[in-house]
Regions:
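Glycine-rich active-site loops that engage anionic ligands at enzyme catalytic sites
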Residues: 380-432
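Short, well-ordered amphipathic alpha-helical segments that serve as non-catalytic structural scaffolds
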Residues: 45-61, 191-207, 258, 262
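Condensing-enzyme catalytic core mediating Claisen C-C bond formation in acyl metabolism
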Residues: 1-43, 140-192, 267, 277, ...
Length: 474
């Protein structure tokens, strides 16, 4: 039976406590949420999706070259019109001829992506990634960030035995006209509409109330309990799948992350119900089995933000737009070097067997112009040089990032390539340079982040994150 073969999650390490929101605004709309996950200044739905996918394959026996279908669900793509999946495919090294689908518009789009993968043949990759934004004084309070990646195929450890759907027109319940989530806030109407749709979707599956775990639509930490009581599900069965309490409302990814967390607690033969809702559509999935899920440590390895830092990091405070660029690279040149910028692909010289990075032009050892054999560098390396860039010290295209993140570190990282190595210049991310000392010899790991935006085009590429042992304060 088809189902989930492998899975991984990614949740940004930064957290904002609801108490800080209440202290600032005198109240909070984040009901039942203790804290929420906050994307770094250089993160968005694409970078989080990439990280979840890389975690999946780094702990999987599956070959990414066998994937023939990729579906990504989000309510907040980086651009209103662009192919998010094409960027994901390139960055993660999936086959160029893979069939792609981007699903958006509402928070149940993750259910559409999962159902499509279940219904088809072959090996499918489903990714739910979101970081919704709202009005800071009201609708933003519960909104978090995160991503889930699932590999779908035959003979799965977690079988999806039944899927049920229900839809109705639900005007005024969570909509977005431009850049931020809105709702008319008619609480009883919203709650009753959601419960009606969720109940009907459950009735359209073979699920009964004797399930072992339930993961229900959770835009906050209280609604899933109301839904459970209304459909006679023991609220104890929600325990492992309630993630909104600690990462917030993650749009289309909330239930997906909650489902994977619940499946990691389940044992063989146990049943887990997952119910998505969004825009008037509800979908219920009956899953049987357990799953090893990569990335669950993200729930524990966290760092707190002040509310002022949160507003700056999310871009809610005004940032200055700078023209020009001291480190500008033309788009054609950037495109030609994507394999190196995304996947750290180096080149082996056929004449002297030495490694060059990037694999372009003349060999950096024998200086002959050759056609390099492409070989990937390791994702983990060592800092051999570092410098902290303060305000006013960055090239113009990094000004907006620096305004949101504060001081940042530029490093040179030595990465193994077989029995040789290459040195790569890059930025460090997910580190407060005012609190954490950067030392030569520290180990770091590559990740994909936003590098800068120019003329409306976001340039993505490799940055490095420190290992946890390097996050010690002086």
């Amino acid at each position: 039976m088809r189902g989930i073969l492998e899975a991984a999650i990614y949740v940004p390490r930064w957290r904002l406590e609801t108490a800080n929101i209440s202290e600032t605004w005198g109240q909070s709309t984040a009901k039942g949420i203790d804290e929420k996950a906050v994307p770094a200044a250089d993160e968005d739905t694409l970078t989080m999706a990439i990280e979840a996918v890389e975690r999946l394959f780094s702990n999987s026996t599956a070959d990414r070259n066998d994937v023939d279908h990729v579906a990504v669900a989000t309510t907040t793509p980086p651009l209103a019109e662009s192919d998010l999946v094409a960027k994901l495919r390139t960055a993660t090294g999936l086959p160029a001829n893979v069939r792609t689908a981007t699903l958006t518009q509402h928070t149940a789009s993750g259910a559409e992506a999962l159902a499509t993968a279940i219904d088809r043949d072959g090996l499918s990759l489903v990714v739910c990634s979101d970081c919704p934004v709202g009005i800071p004084a009201t609708t933003d309070h519960p909104l978090g960030a995160g991503a889930a990646a699932m590999l779908i195929g035959e003979d799965a450890r977690t079988a999806v035995s039944s899927v049920g759907w229900y839809s109705l027109d639900a005007p005024g319940i969570r909509f977005r006209t431009a850049d931020s989530v809105q709702s008319l806030g008619i609480t009883n109407y919203e709650r009753e509409t959601i419960i009606t749709a969720v109940t009907a979707a459950m009735e359209n599956t073979t699920t009964d109330r004797s399930i072992d775990y339930a993961v229900l639509h959770q835009p906050n930490g209280t609604l899933p309990y109301r839904i459970a009581r209304s459909v006679s599900i023991d609220t104890e069965k929600l325990t492992h799948g309630i993630v909104s309490r600690t990462i917030g409302d993650v749009g289309t990814a909330t239930v997906a992350i909650g489902l994977l967390k619940a499946l990691s607690e389940a044992t063989t033969g146990e049943d887990t119900l997952a119910v998505f809702y969004g825009g008037g559509t509800a979908a219920a999935f009956n899953c049987t089995g357990s799953l090893n899920v990569s990335g669950l440590l993200d729930f524990d390895e966290t760092e707190s933000l002040t509310y002022a830092t949160y507003l700056r990091q999310r871009g809610y405070l005004g940032t200055e737009q700078i023209t020009g660029g001291g480190a500008n690279v033309s788009l054609p040149t950037w495109q030609r070097s994507l394999d190196s910028r995304y996947r750290l692909v180096a080149g082996r010289c056929p004449l002297c067997d030495s490694i060059s990075f990037p694999p372009d032009g003349a060999c950096q050892t024998c200086h002959e112009r050759v056609s390099f054999e492409h070989v990937p560098a390791e994702r983990e390396g060592t800092i051999v040089a570092a410098s902290v860039i303060g305000h006013g010290g960055a090239p113009p295209e990094f000004t907006t990032y620096q305004q949101r993140s504060g001081r940042y570190a530029a490093v040179i990282v030595e990465l193994p390539v077989g029995d040789q190595s290459v040195r790569v210049p890059a930025q460090l991310t997910d580190i407060d340079t005012d609190e954490v000392a950067i030392e030569i010899g520290d180990t770091v790991r590559s990740t994909i982040r936003r590098i800068y935006e120019q003329e409306g085009v976001v340039r993505y590429g490799v940055k490095f994150t420190p290992n946890m042992k390097n996050r010690q304060t002086d």
